[in-house]
Amino acid sequence: MSEELGKISKPQAENVQLKKKLYLVQNIQNYFPGNKDFESLLKEYWDSISDQLDNLEKTAGNINFIYIEGMYQEYDVASKLLNDNNKWCLSTIESRVKSGSNYKKIEDENNYKQLIDWTRIAQLGFVSENAKEVTEENYKKIITERSTIIHDELNSIKEGEAALFMISSGSHK
């Protein structure tokens, strides 16, 4: 009898629990305040994310760490910002923090603020080639530093631990 092509066997749960795990979730915010249809879709999205994370925790172990891209504040400040800007994301992480997950900031404040500034400058456009080159050079430098900061933090996760990383962009490797 021939073997079925494309069949992937399900890994044993105990094997998964011994490994490092990083769960990436797209941090979708409410870009259309007051639009009830969009808010309904957001609620569905975040409810689905929470359910999927619950299922992962049942089989692969609890989430030890929670990171949110763009957040350099400690949890008390970050949670207030999330409450104002993305209550669905806050709801998803708040229950996990209360049950023992450790929220950790993923960004360095100075680095992140410089990234915002260089991004804004780049969006203005350029008349001179020199200004463009200076901006590109500084932007690349700050992006490289940021990537190292995030990479080092994520590499601190130990075998058997799990982390949730709420990302705003798809630029992480």
Model-derived segments and their meaning:
Residues 1-173:
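Compositional signal for N-terminal targeting/processing segments
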